[in-house]
Swiss-Prot record:
Keywords tagged on the record: ATP-binding, Magnesium, Manganese, Metal-binding, Nucleotide-binding, Nucleotidyltransferase, Transferase
InterPro entries recorded: adnlytase_SelO, SelO
Entry annotated with the keyword Nucleotidyltransferase: yes
E.C. number(s) listed in UniProt: 2.7.7.-, 2.7.7.108
Identification of the protein by name: Protein nucleotidyltransferase YdiU
Record family assignment: Belongs to the SELO family.
């Protein structure tokens, strides 16, 4: 089957990019590809059998027209000016059979005009982390970019140490970022900001294109998508680590996996990025940061959208966030209805977990085994303060009895939203260390496991992290 690529970005937004081709690596070789995603995109298996090829930037497929995008942004709350694709190249937009499109973005593709002081490269460590994280999030049901392939090489890349140069093929319906809009707003070119908005609406919100107040309706939906995404992050214990405005997806996707981390111990102020000295992007601050980022996006739209309309959309953020978060947390607790004591029960559980440094994922998974008429709980042994747990658990069982549902039905629901497996940093690190020794077994094994996060397992993927794996420091260097 011949793949079809179109050039909407190149044709419709000529001042937002520089056209250029990838720079191949030395002795590049394909070490992993996403068979399930490739099948979804109707990619012929033969493309994965001919060396690095397009996956390593060595050649292009018919219809591809590679380019690097320019954007700007706020980093750690400070205006950083022009940024852009410093090591990534958009190879093309694949047109799918249903009329939708999928960007093919090659990360680590070499120097671009936006590389600043960088070398345009990515390392094997970071490409493995992003591939694992994006696929883990996808199978958890959270909107995200996807990983299609990883290529490693003999090219040395200099970070804290010398590492292997690598490339990741990332795919997404769009790579539109808040930072694209900021770039032209701060250059005092509001007509180009409007062109970006029109492009987004035309191709991704086409049902709004003929509406008189399309910009208000569109921005309101961007706010809602962002609020929903952040709510989902919080419910699974995901910390992004670098929520700069240039890393915010207009479509509400999880974008740019760097020093991310999933909670091990329940620590509301968890900071996964060791460069985040002030804790701006801590786990519990993510909802507030996302709203701040939306306010920056709203500012770029103010030359052609009424400020009252923008503020009205921003005001909806908190309620959308709380609605999505509340619905998912009630499911995690096994509540079929909404009762006034639900928030108090959840907050008391969180307080107990924080005091005891309880494992976030294991606590909710074990809670899924609760039988409402039994005072015994397998979760009890996870707590040192048994009296405090017993007091909470008695009230929790009483709350469960208010819903007309069998234990088996409730347990099935809870186990469908409380994963047994999340991508803990130590699991990723183990796969990375093996891959750096040319052993890809663990990389493939872990990818396969992450496809079924809600299934029970009896291996160390679902055990408590070892002591060395709990506080792994992760940086932005990639």
């Amino acid at each position: 089957m011949t793949l079809s690529f179109i050039t909407r970005w190149r044709d419709e937004l000529p001042e937002t990019y520089t056209a250029l081709s990838p720079t191949p690596l030395n002795n590049a070789r394909l070490i992993w590809h996403n068979t399930e995603l490739a099948n979804t995109l109707s990619i012929p298996s033969s493309l994965f059998k001919n060396g690095a090829g397009v996956w390593g930037g060595e050649n292009l497929l018919p219809g591809m027209s590679p380019l690097a995008q320019v954007y700007s942004g706020h980093q750690f709350g400070v205006w950083a000016g022009q940024l852009g694709d410093g090591r990534g190249i958009l190879l093309g937009e694949q047109l799918l059979a249903d009329g939708t499109t999928m960007d093919w973005h090659l990360k680590g593709a070499g120097l671009t005009p936006y590389s600043r002081m960088g070398d345009g490269r990515a390392v094997l460590r970071s490409t493995i982390r992003e591939s694992l994280a994006s696929e883990a999030m996808h199978y958890l049901g959270i909107p995200t970019t996807r990983a299609l392939s990883i290529v490693t090489s003999d090219s040395p890349v200099y970070r804290e140490t010398v590492e292997s140069g690598a490339m990741l093929m990332r795919v997404a319906p769009s790579h539109l970022r808040f930072g694209h809009f900021e770039h032209f707003y701060y250059r005092r070119e509001p007509e180009k900001v409007r062109q970006l908005a029109d492009f987004a609406i035309r191709h991704y919100w086409s049902h709004l294109d003929d509406e008189e107040d399309k910009y208000r309706l569109w921005f309101t939906d961007v706010v809602a998508r962002t609020a929903s995404l952040i709510a989902q992050w919080q419910t699974v214990g995901f910390a992004h680590g670098v929520m700069n405005t240039d890393n915010m997806s207009l479509l509400g996707l999880t974008l740019d996996y760097g020093p991310f981390g999933f909670l091990d111990d329940y620590e509301p102020g968890f900071i996964c990025n060791h460069s985040d000295h002030q804790g701006r992007y801590s786990f519990d601050n993510q909802p507030a940061v996302a709203l701040w980022n939306l306010q920056r996006l709203a500012q770029t739209l103010s030359p052609f959208v009424a400020v009252d309309a923008l503020n009205e959309a921003l005001d909806s953020y908190q309620q959308v966030l709380l609605t999505h978060y509340g619905q998912r947390m009630r499911q995690k607790l096994g509540f079929m209805t909404e009762q006034k004591e639900d928030n108090a029960l959840l907050n008391e559980l969180f307080s107990l977990m924080a005091r005891e440094r309880s494992d976030y994922t294991r606590t909710f998974r074990m809670l899924s085994l609760t039988e409402q008429h039994s005072a015994a709980s397998p979760l009890r042994d996870e707590f040192i303060d048994r009296a405090a747990f017993d007091d909470w658990f008695a009230r929790y069982r009483g709350r469960l009895q208010q819903d007309e549902i069998t234990d088996s039905e409730r347990q099935q629901l809870m186990q469908s939203v409380n994963p047994a497996l999340v991508l803990r940093n130590w699991l990723a690190q183990r796969a990375i260390e093996a891959a750096e020794k040319d052993d890809m077994t663990e990389l493939h094994r872990l990818h396969e496991a992450l496809r079924n996060p809600f299934s029970d397992r009896d291996d160390d993927y679902v055990s408590r992290p070892p002591d060395w794996g709990k506080r792994l420091e992760v940086s932005c260097s990639s």
